[in-house]
Amino acid sequence: VEKLSINGVIPKKAAKEIRNKAKFNVKEIELIENKTKHDFIAYINNVSSYIGESAKYFHHGVTSSDIIDTSFSIQLKQSAEIIIKELKLVLKEIKIKAIKHKNTIMIGRSHGIHAEPITFGLKLASFYCEFKRNLNRMKSAKDEVSICAISGPVGTYNSIDPSVEKYVAAKLDLKTENVSTQVIP
């Protein structure tokens, strides 16, 4: 809505009214959804009921998928950030323990049976390397899911300018989908 008003597609007054009045009530959404049988239409109707006259611009040019997919991307990105943070803590602790136990003897294993002695520190160093790869995979996964798709029905930008998608993506620290469709593939 903000970029639509900047582009002159909707009145600036409407964008301000939407920003100031938009809110929702989960219980009301549930009641509306029971009638409409569509979760996102129920959400739109509920938010619109609080906005007033400018509500006609609230969902202008976008599809439910534009909003739902982009929201899901944000959730995935935020989840990945939590996992990455925790993996870094795990790595730090494994490294500390590996150094502490660099001379702690333990039995090695090969093919599931006892083998030559190794140190517990070596075993932990191996775990450290594995978790470091997991951290890199998680960073890559975060990058892959950090996608914004605001391209309108069937992803053709017929009802919304691509600059809106770029604007929203920048605001949300997401990338845009390279080949747009109605949903993020």
Predicted stretch roles:
Residues 1-157, 161-170, 176:
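A helix-coil-helix interface module used to build multimeric assemblies
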Residues 3, 179-185:
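Short, intrinsically disordered, charge-balanced linker/junction segments flanking boundaries
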